[in-house]
């Protein structure tokens, strides 16, 4: 709405929501019949963020059911039904364990930490990131490759707990009820079965350091992070109720699994073993704790991760769905970028299938899809801002193959029908 000032010949505009004038705010956005100021926009965004944070529908006791957690995971992650089921049950039980602990019952419910094993690009990290969006307990992600044992250059394992504290705004009580996801856990495996003069500061030493915080201990965490020193004050965090989820690609584990049970023999009478033609994800389904020990994880560490969830290789159909269906699907993202240039981006179905096959050939899974699309669309995104009258860009299979350029459809104002040209 607008109001005319006493001495001003100009109209003063007011926010339709809070009533502030255009002079009291930084920005006033006009609609057909209403105005909204930047402060009200920020307030609306805060409300939306709060609602999305608690978007899980909860049952009467305040604990989201596994199916409700699974439903939210389905919005962002395609396939991987078994891993979703394992995570949904684990998070549901985590909520129940926290509720149970407050009632001081006689039976103590122990936590079941989880190990996610799957090929590169199968969705391990995305599952964890999606959980972070929807949980109302503190959640943090850590990278195992940055960790070293105490006394060496690198991050202490206590830094993981510090990140959880930061995620809970330094509320120790909330942090003690949180969930931690440690990515690239396979990178801290022992480098060799044989003892060495050189100390393995980022392998077995880190596993030993992680044992206590995963099992449950009172960790002393420097409030500002970094290394500890005697004059520093520490925050005491009990990790007993913190749920740990570890994930890794475990490259080479499939060979260990395939060899197990085959038996070995030598000489002229030895039987010839047929090669294992199964895909990596299929082989991972047969994983046993002993395979992880051979890979380089120490027995105590494997014992603290009793739940093993494996992820499968993504086939062409799954990769095509990943390109199109999730809320943050890559095709939707690029279409939105082109919309900002007032251009419609269209992918033919055969083109998406070819993109999926290229990702499979590269053995990069879903992670390789963005790289392929960037290569395909690079020249178009470079040229498009300088072109006039382009209404639509069509990507066909020959474009993905690099045999031709995308089809540009121009809107010709002087003719009834648009003219199509290849650019």
UniProtKB/Swiss-Prot annotation:
It holds the Pfam family ClpB_D2-small. The keyword Amino-acid biosynthesis does not apply. This is ATP-dependent Clp protease ATP-binding subunit ClpX. Component of the ClpX-ClpP complex. Forms a hexameric ring that, in the presence of ATP, binds to fourteen ClpP subunits assembled into a disk-like structure with a central cavity, resembling the structure of eukaryotic proteasomes. Gene3D superfamilies: 1.10.8.60, ClpX chaperone, C4-type zinc finger domain, P-loop containing nucleotide triphosphate hydrolases. HAMAP family: ClpX. GO terms for biological process: cell division; proteolysis involved in protein catabolic process. It comes from Methylorubrum populi (strain ATCC BAA-705 / NCIMB 13946 / BJ001). Zn(2+) binds at residues 15, 18, 37, 40. GO terms for molecular function: ATP binding; ATP hydrolysis activity; ATP-dependent protein folding chaperone; protein dimerization activity; unfolded protein binding; zinc ion binding. Residues 3-56 form the ClpX-type ZB domain. Belongs to the ClpX chaperone family. Keywords: ATP-binding, Chaperone, Metal-binding, Nucleotide-binding, Zinc. GO terms for cellular component: HslUV protease complex. ATP-dependent specificity component of the Clp protease. It directs the protease to specific substrates. Can perform chaperone functions in the absence of ClpP.
């Amino acid at each position: 709405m607008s109001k005319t000032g006493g001495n001003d010949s100009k109209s003063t505009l007011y926010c339709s929501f809070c009533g502030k004038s255009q002079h009291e705010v930084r920005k006033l956005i006009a609609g057909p019949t209403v105005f909204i100021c930047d402060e009200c926009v920020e307030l609306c965004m805060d409300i939306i963020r709060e609602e999305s944070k608690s978007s899980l529908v909860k049952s009467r006791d305040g604990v989201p059911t596994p199916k409700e957690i699974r439903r939210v995971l389905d919005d962002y992650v395609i396939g991987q039904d078994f891993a979703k089921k394992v995570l949904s049950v684990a998070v549901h039980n985590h909520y129940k364990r926290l509720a149970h602990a407050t009632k001081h019952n006689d039976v103590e419910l122990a936590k079941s930490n989880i190990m996610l094993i799957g090929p590169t690009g199968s969705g391990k990290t995305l599952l964890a990131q999606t959980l972070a969006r929807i949980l109302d307990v503190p959640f943090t992600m850590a990278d195992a490759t940055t960790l070293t044992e105490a006394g060496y250059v690198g991050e202490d394992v206590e830094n993981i707990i510090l990140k959880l504290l930061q995620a809970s705004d330094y509320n120790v009580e909330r942090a003690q009820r949180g969930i931690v996801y440690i990515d690239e856990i396979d990178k801290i495996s022992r480098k060799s079965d044989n003892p060495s003069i050189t100390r393995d500061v980022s392998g077995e030493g880190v596993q030993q350091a992680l044992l206590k915080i995963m099992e449950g201990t009172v960790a002393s965490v420097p409030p500002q992070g970094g290394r500890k020193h005697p004059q520093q004050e520490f925050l005491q965090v009990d990790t007993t109720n913190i749920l740990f989820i570890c994930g890794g690609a475990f490259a080479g584990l499939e060979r260990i699994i395939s060899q197990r049970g085959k038996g070995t023999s030598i000489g002229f009478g030895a039987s010839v073993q047929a090669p294992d033609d199964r895909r990596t994800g299929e082989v991972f389904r047969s994983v046993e704790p002993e395979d992880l020990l051979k890979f380089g994880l120490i027995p105590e560490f494997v014992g603290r991760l009793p739940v093993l969830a494996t992820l499968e290789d993504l086939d062409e159909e799954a990769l095509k769905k990943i390109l199109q269906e999730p809320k943050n699907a890559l095709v939707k993202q690029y279409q939105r970028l082109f919309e900002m240039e007032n251009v419609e981006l269209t992918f033919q179905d055969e083109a998406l299938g070819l993109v999926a096959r290229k990702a499979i050939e590269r053995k990069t899974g879903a992670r390789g899809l963005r790289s392929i699309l960037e290569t395909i669309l690079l020249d178009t995104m470079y040229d498009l801002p300088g072109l006039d009258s382009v209404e639509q860009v069509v990507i066909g299979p020959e474009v993905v193959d690099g045999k031709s350029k995308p089809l540009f459809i121009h809107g010709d104002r002087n003719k009834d029908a648009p003219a199509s040209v290849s650019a």
